[in-house]
Amino acid sequence: GGITYATDVETPQGVVVETGRPIECLRTLLSSGRYTVGHIVCFRDSAYARSVPETALVREDGQLWYDAEGQAWLDPTDPQVLQYITALVKECGELGFKEVLLDQFCYPADTTGVANTAADPAQVLADFAENLRSALPEGTALSVVVRSTDSLSVEQMAELFDRLYVPAEGDLAAVKAALPEGYDPETRVVAMTAEAPQSGSYVIVS
């Protein structure tokens, strides 16, 4: 529901944009030679859903649907939602991020009570992932956080994305076991953790 830099992408009222971080300062950081990852939370976005409720997952009565933690979700089939996320992904690539990491790139794990779920959620997400890749400059990696395998399987995600990030509460061993042949878990599966493991790829989350 918030953007941590002064984006040029048009955002609806209610989505907080930190204008105190000018985009030129971000460009300076991105040109420093460091390996940078742009983190974009996609469909679990209460601020956007409340601001533009017609783009969200809803109940049978047309009111916003909320998950067990009280968060609203955007509809992955809504054109305005797809255009918004695509614009953010494209901007991150053009700014110079080496990698764009998609989070909550899924339907809710439990969609009980949702009136407007897609007939084939996996196809909806796979098609969108391919469109996002085409929006990025050549050489920019596109990765995903494995939050749920109900919409896309690990094997499908491995085919669509350069790296799979597994949160601390996730099952890292199960993700690695489900990888297709040829997908190197040492370089393409990243553990999200509070402290560094003894081996493998990881990212520190504080």
Positions of PLM-derived features:
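Aromatic-lined carbohydrate-binding/catalytic grooves of carbohydrate-active enzymes
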Residues: G1-G20
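Glycine-rich tight-turn/loop motif centered on a GG-T
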Residues: T11-V15, T112-Q123
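Substrate-binding cleft of carbohydrate-active enzyme catalytic domains
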Residues: C25-F43, V89
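Aromatic-lined carbohydrate-recognition surfaces of secreted/lumenal glycan-active proteins
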Residues: Y35-D45, L101-D103, P121-E155, Y165-A168, ...
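Conserved beta-strand positions
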Residues: L102, D110, V166-E169, V203-V205
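C-terminal active-site rim and adjoining tail of enzyme catalytic domains
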Residues: V175-S206
